[in-house]
Amino acid sequence: MQKVRTIEETREAVAAARAHGKVVGLVPTMGFLHEGHLSLIRVARDSGADFFVVSIFVNPKQFGPNEDLARYPRDEERDFALLEEESIDVLFMPSVETMYPPDVTTTVSVGPLARTLEGAHRPGHFDGVAVIVLKLFD
């Protein structure tokens, strides 16, 4: 498993895999992995992916004003061990500065749907999710 922290390293690994005819599967997470995350890797494998990128990024834009980003659970060593068992190829663990550089602003407005269900209690949550998913698929 290659552990990378930059967008450039991730793009290089994905480009090399594609150049060898690999089908890339991406599983975005915020870490503290559980069986649900691991099942997504297995579904990607069963769907034909043969090169796997998992991201671990605790996205500050997904947290509401009264939610404690600092208290979000993290256990990198456990996450590494679980991902090794799944034989993933690349683990992308960017910093906040990498994903949100000061000279670039990216926003996504999910619209009225973002104010229902979970969004009714967590303003900005779904917009934050949409931004990071957009960036990860870019």
Residue ranges and their predicted role:
Residues M1-D138:
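Nucleotidyltransferase catalytic core that binds NTPs
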